[in-house]
Amino acid sequence: MRKIYILLLSVMLVCIGCEWRLSSSDDKADTHVVVERYDRIQSLYLTTGDFSALQQMNISYPQQTRTLIEDVLKIGQVNDPEINVKFLSFFQDTTLQTIISSAEQQYADMDDINQELTDAFTRLQVMIPDIEIPQIYAQIGSLDQSVIVGNGMLGISLDKYLGVDYPLYLREDYGYTDEQRQMMCRLYIVPDCLGFFLLSLYPMPYDRELTQLERDMYIGKIQWTVNQAMNKTVFNTLYTRNVGHYMKSHPDMTVSRLLKESIFVRPSNALEEFSE
């Protein structure tokens, strides 16, 4: 009887172990990213003054609201008794009201972006297994930052992705170059999310002043990784190409190690490692 009990217990442990491994694999395989539509609640409050929308912003999205008010718009502290009035008044500007309307029209549906994010982060997790996918949400700023990353969250400012030929972007007083405007469209949302996310995980060294070449090479590593996660060439520069050549000639180099270690480009454009 004792032998039978031990045998049954062993079988149970094996089954539990198998189930745990399958569940872990399934969890990894079932990565599904959905952009939370904080922008819709924000838009409702800023266009109608609906107090219930403001309450939902503060209760359901406290961190997003704090980040928007204090770090993006920089109009005061979220605990300021008058901050709600300041927030509403700030967006009564005709230009900002136009931006809100345009963003909500262009991004009424973000299913394509959700799918792109899901596919890209799935590939990124294969390349860098220990990363945790941030909570991603959409917001509307005032033509400031494109993507905000911090505290396990990533915010997409839809006002910075209204299209290459969006009228406001073409105005001289905003000073956007043709090169900048090429990236201010829907197609660059996911690459930008990945890029800024990777920058937050692998920040540029601050313990010394970097040369321009080192900065360019650093960005090249980030952009090359984004290309791999996107499964297409979004960024095509001398530095991304050199990183690609380097990785092919160093098959044992992991992406995580590549992003952590210092590399430089010799005059011959050959990518090599160097130690500090």
Segments from the language model and where they lie:
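Short, intrinsically disordered low-complexity segments
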Residues: 1-2, 20
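Exposed boundary/loop context
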Residues: 10-11, 134
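C-terminal motif of bacterial Sec signal peptides marking the signal peptidase cleavage site
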Residues: 14-17
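N-terminal mature-domain "stem" immediately C-terminal to a signal peptide or N-terminal signal-anchor/transmembrane
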Residues: 19-89
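Sec-dependent signal peptide recognition
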Residues: 2-9
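Acidic/His-rich structured neighborhood in mature extracellular/periplasmic domains
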Residues: 86-276
